UniProtKB/Swiss-Prot annotation:
Complex formation: Homodimer.
Protein family per UniProt: Belongs to the IlvD/Edd family.
Stretch forming the signal peptide: none
Gene, per the UniProt record: ilvD
Cofactor(s) of this protein: [2Fe-2S] cluster; Mg(2+)
Keyword tags: 2Fe-2S, Amino-acid biosynthesis, Branched-chain amino acid biosynthesis, Iron, Iron-sulfur, Lyase, Magnesium, Metal-binding
Name of the protein: Dihydroxy-acid dehydratase
GO cellular component term of the entry, any: cytosol
UniProt binding sites for [2Fe-2S] cluster: 122, 195
Residue ranges of the TM segments: none
């Protein structure tokens, strides 16, 4: 039987000093012996997805204490990828995931907390906390800040829904006036919450539902809606119950590793493929699986991508559909329900809120539930009022969207495509694999033959695209932007947005050892592994080389003889210290980023740190 960890600091004569310090935080005699629950918040005024979280930690804390626990709140950092985009700030985004995971580990282990509620929301915060939960393996419940409402404005005489990506695209499109660009800018992000499409933040919050670590609705109910408050309150009660089940009943199904098994990771990836989630989720699921000791690899993702259809298309893949529309269609539980009916889900896995995922679906899937309360929950609608206040409105749609033939969520009999929304490609350009969000690729370019136009940084590629260097038929290759080469594996949202604004979105491809924002669409292939900085073939590509991208057959290759590529490799290695480095790029890299680069693995392994790489150099 496991022992409450907190008793290390609260029991015994020799812990008088520690108890004295606990008392200084407000604990009383009756609190010693209760489970100490860490409330891991991520409030910051820098990020719209987190700006409303300030008081929500204490909301959860009050519920924990009402349920018989002791709550102690602390905060992590949170980077806004949209604000960090397009400049050297993006170098810090992915490495911040590791810092978040470490900071949670440090705080929880230093103070011997028994369990935790993770209040996350945006791109690297949910993954960082997820990695920490798997690493620590103490009871944990995730509750996110929720998606923002989609923006709306009149552009060129028509009312349209908007998000962050629209602001980027129209700003680079010279057919829009300054006034029209400003109208889009002012309307694109109207409320608090994570950006309104199926971008990385919302994708990850949805995946916590499939993993079994969050409550139904966590990925889809709006940040502004009063219904979201119930998730925070319930999380506080639930975590105390989970702690008691683990420490008093030795119930492994109350722990993250007991819940997030290999089958649960497959469920999460199947959901991601079905909903056309962000390609970044591949990195984060691989990383979390490693922390959990689960052997989940690119081979598993490739296998799943070949059998799971695309059942949902959300912005950026479908610009008029946002998370509020997914929620109206039954949210993540509805997508999981469709997968389960088709035999594409292991519903026997436990969750934090139900004995099994099957039990959860019986109540929460609108295709099978008889609960009017559940149906009312999924009618939660946007309020249409700009605000930074959580739970500030209670609007309802008149009905839920149950159309599984032409609605937002489709059945497996009526999918958007029989191939899923994500695919893994292999070939001489990416022997260890690379990722493409097929849900965002036009059918006309699923097979693409073009010529390489090579850039050794995102900045150079942006200049080339805006300067007219890139033409129809080009494959824009951006290299030395991987985890080691960047370092930090920048997102390439600006290059893909500018290709769209130049009318090249369906006429060009983009291939990189970097990654893409969840807001990216088009023939955008990232995570090329091995990356240029570790000797990957992408470092040997030259402008003018023929490139084949064949998504149906999962192939990406440089169509050159092996002897030509071998000669280039020999020439590269002859450069000595200058080998596998960008020849013309000037970039200041801080000691913090150099430390990350020294330890990180490539994208095929989740870009996690591997300390043995440093240890081997001693």
């Amino acid at each position: 039987m496991p022992q409450y960890r907190s008793r290390t600091t609260t029991h015994g004569r020799n812990m008088a000093g520690a108890r004295g310090l606990w008392r200084a935080t407000g604990m009383k005699d009756g609190d010693f012996g209760k489970p100490i629950i860490a409330v891991v918040n991520s409030f910051t005024q820098f990020v719209p997805g987190h700006v409303h979280l300030k008081d929500l930690g204490q909301l959860v804390a009050r519920e924990i204490e009402a349920a018989g626990g002791v709550a102690k709140e602390f905060n992590t950092i949170a980077v806004d990828d949209g604000i960090a985009m397009g400049h050297d700030g993006m170098l810090y985004s992915l490495p911040s995931r590791e810092l978040i995971a470490d900071s949670v580990e440090y705080m929880v282990n230093a103070h011997c907390a028994d369990a935790m509620v993770c209040i996350s929301n945006c791109d690297k915060i949910t993954p960082g906390m997820l990695m920490a939960a798997m690493r620590l393996n103490i009871p944990a419940v995730f509750v996110s800040g929720g998606p923002m409402e989609a923006g709306k404005t009149v552009v060129k005489g028509a009312t349209r829904a908007l998000d962050l990506v629209d602001a980027m695209v129209v700003a680079a499109d010279e057919s829009y006036t300054d006034e029209e660009v400003q109208a889009v800018e002012r309307s694109a992000c109207p409320t608090c919450g994570s950006c309104s499409g199926m971008f990385t933040a919302n994708s990850m919050n949805c995946l916590t539902e499939a993993l079994g670590l969050s409550l139904p609705g966590n990925g889809s109910v709006l940040a502004t809606h009063a219904d979201r408050e119930k998730l925070f309150r319930e999380a506080g009660h639930l975590i105390v119950d989970l702690a008691r089940r683990w420490y008093e009943q030795d119930d492994v199904s109350a722990t993250p590793r007991g819940i997030a098994t290999h089958a649960a990771f497959e469920n999460a990836m199947s959901l991601d493929i079905a909903m056309g989630g962000s390609t970044n989720t591949v990195l984060h699921l691989l990383a979390a699986a490693q922390e959990a000791g689960v052997d989940f690899t690119m081979a598993d993702i490739d296998r799943l991508s070949r059998r799971v259809p695309c059942l949902c298309k959300v912005a950026p893949a479908k610009s008029d559909v946002h998370m509020e529309d997914v929620h109206r269609a039954g949210g993540i539980m509805a997508i999981l329900g469709e997968l389960e009916r088709a035999g594409l889900l292991d519903a026997s896995r436990p969750t934090v809120h139900a004995p099994t995922l099957k039990d959860a679906l019986e109540r929460w899937d609108i295709g099978r539930t008889s609960s009017e309360e559940v149906r009312t929950f999924f009618r939660a609608a946007p309020g249409g009022v700009p605000t930074q206040v959580a739970f500030s409105q209670s609007a309802r749609w008149d009905s839920v969207d149950e159309d599984r033939q032409k609605g937002v969520i489709r059945s497996t009999e009526h999918p958007f495509s029989h191939d899923g929304g994500l695919a893994v490609l292999f070939g001489n350009l990416a022997p260890e694999g690379c990722i493409v969000k097929t849900a965002g690729v036009d059918e006309s370019i699923l097979t693409f033959r073009g010529t390489a136009r090579v850039y050794e940084s995102q900045d150079a590629a942006v200049s080339g695209i805006l300067g007219g260097q890139v033409v129809a038929g080009d494959v824009v290759v951006i290299r030395y932007e991987g985890p080691k080469g960047g370092p930090g594996m920048q997102e390439m949202l600006y290059p893909t947005s500018y290709l769209k604004s130049k009318g090249l979105g369906k006429l060009c491809a983009l291939v990189t050892d970097g990654r893409f924002s969840g807001g990216t669409s088009g023939l955008s292939i990232g995570h090329v592994s091995p990356e240029a900085a570790e000797g990957g073939l992408i470092a040997l590509v030259e402008t003018g080389d023929p490139v084949l991208i064949d998504i149906p057959n999962r192939i990406i290759s440089i169509a050159l003889p092996d002897e030509v590529l071998a000669a280039r490799r020999t020439a590269m290695e002859a450069k000595g210290e200058a080998a596998w480095k960008p020849a013309e790029r000037q970039r200041k890299v801080s000691p913090a980023l150099r430390a990350y680069a020294a330890m990180t693995t490539n994208a095929a392994r989740g870009a996690v740190r591997d300390v043995s790489q440093v240890e081997r150099k001693r």
